[in-house]
């Protein structure tokens, strides 16, 4: 104790009067900033959980602010088509929905007379829409590609009326949200049937001309960017080419290797040309000579059918006045 006082006196009076330096304390994080960080972390955890286990899809009718009658009316206005509301409502009612609702009523113990729903299935409208769509598409394709054979026209029509194309169009037109079905998401077969029922309702409401334009605008457009043999699957292109040339009184094609590169590498490339009467009619690439020959045959078929990559695009500006829509409706 005494030695400490002696040292303070030796340092002088200024040391006694000097203020004590404050102790440095690490800054404490604010409550607000900590809450924000925790909230962001919680949101990230929730996002990762939804990515791992996404929730099951929910019908739009099970969410708030849903008016089915208003949605039906808005559907026609959105497409700029005049539908009969009764026909349009019928087009969205599937037989599986009627059966499921009647079964639910029976389980609740409701009387048999009250179990039956006053709803009509869209089966008849769907059959009319399917028949008219196939006939109308056949006429469109025959007028646009007169050199395409009947088998090719048939395959293109099957592609445009298939489940993949029709369901893609129906989902983008919000047909799935209005469809009354037992299951959700709506199965592809049910959605396809509903879309053709909508076409059948439009056919009875606005006539064949407006329905033909509807088919042109929403189904023919699905051919954009598609190659012919993506829609028409053929197994033996060379055999088909020989038949087509024979119909035109042209000699059978002769294949020749025109170019090649990297034959000893892992990625070889061969070009095979097809000659008729010493004239090059087509040339195609491939990783083998056989594949290149088949591709050359496909190129030649595209030229014969007028379905080349640089073909004239489909004219959507003016509908044809001589459309055989009356014949379509009578045939359907």
Curated annotation (Swiss-Prot):
Q: Name one GO biological process term.
A: RNA processing
Positions of the RNase III domain? 86-228
- Pfam entry (one): DSRM_MRPL44
GO CC terms, sorted = microprocessor complex; mitochondrial large ribosomal subunit
- Which residues does the annotated transit peptide occupy? 1-30
Domain DRBM: from-to ranges:
236-306
Q: Where in the cell is it found?
A: Mitochondrion
GO molecular function annotation: double-stranded RNA binding; ribonuclease III activity
UniProt cross-references to PROSITE patterns, sorted A to Z: DS_RBD (PS50137)
Q: Which domain of life is it from?
A: Eukaryota
- What Enzyme Commission number(s) does the record list for this chain? 3.1.26.-
Q: Which UniProt keywords apply?
A: Endonuclease, Hydrolase, Mitochondrion, Nuclease, Ribonucleoprotein, Ribosomal protein, RNA-binding, Transit peptide
CDD domains recorded: DSRM_MRPL44 (cd19874)
Please verify whether the record's keywords include tRNA processing.
no
What's this protein's function? Component of the 39S subunit of mitochondrial ribosome. May have a function in the assembly/stability of nascent mitochondrial polypeptides exiting the ribosome.
PANTHER family in alphabetical order: LARGE RIBOSOMAL SUBUNIT PROTEIN ML44, RIBONUCLEASE III
Self-association and partners: Component of the mitochondrial ribosome large subunit (39S) which comprises a 16S rRNA and about 50 distinct proteins.
Family affiliation = Belongs to the ribonuclease III family. Mitochondrion-specific ribosomal protein mL44 subfamily.
Name of the protein this chain belongs to = Large ribosomal subunit protein mL44
């Amino acid at each position: 104790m005494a030695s400490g006082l002696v040292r303070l006196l030796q340092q002088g009076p200024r040391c006694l009067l000097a203020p004590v330096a404050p102790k440095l304390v690490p800054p404490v994080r604010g409550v607000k900033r900590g809450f924000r960080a925790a909230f962001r972390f919680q949101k990230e955890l929730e996002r990762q959980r939804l990515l791992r286990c996404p929730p099951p899809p929910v019908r739009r009718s099970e969410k708030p602010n849903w008016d089915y009658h208003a949605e039906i009316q808005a559907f026609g206005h959105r497409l700029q088509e005049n539908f009969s509301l009764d026909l349009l409502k019928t087009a969205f009612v599937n037989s599986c929905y009627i059966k499921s609702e009647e079964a639910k009523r029976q389980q609740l113990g409701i009387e048999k007379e009250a179990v039956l729903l006053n709803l009509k299935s869209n089966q008849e409208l769907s059959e009319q829409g399917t028949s008219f769509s196939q006939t109308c598409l056949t006429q469109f394709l025959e007028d646009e590609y007169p050199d395409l054979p009947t088998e090719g026209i048939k395959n293109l029509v099957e592609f445009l009326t298939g489940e993949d194309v029709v369901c893609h169009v129906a989902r983008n037109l919000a047909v799935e949200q209005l469809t009354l079905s037992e299951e959700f998401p709506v199965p592809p077969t049910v959605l396809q049937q509903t879309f053709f029922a909508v076409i059948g309702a439009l056919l009875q409401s606005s006539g064949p001309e407006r329905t033909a334009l509807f088919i042109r605008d929403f189904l023919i457009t699905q051919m954009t960017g598609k190659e012919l043999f993506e829609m028409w699957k053929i197994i033996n292109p060379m055999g088909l080419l020989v038949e087509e040339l024979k119909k035109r009184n042209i000699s059978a094609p002769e294949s020749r290797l025109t170019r090649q590169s990297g034959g000893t590498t892992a990625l070889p490339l061969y070009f095979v040309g097809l000659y008729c009467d010493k004239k090059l009619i087509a040339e195609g690439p491939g990783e083998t000579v056989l594949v290149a020959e088949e591709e050359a045959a496909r190129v030649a078929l595209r030229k014969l059918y007028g379905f080349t990559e640089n073909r004239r695009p489909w004219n959507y500006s003016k509908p044809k006045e001589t459309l055989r829509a009356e014949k379509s409706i009578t045939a359907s």
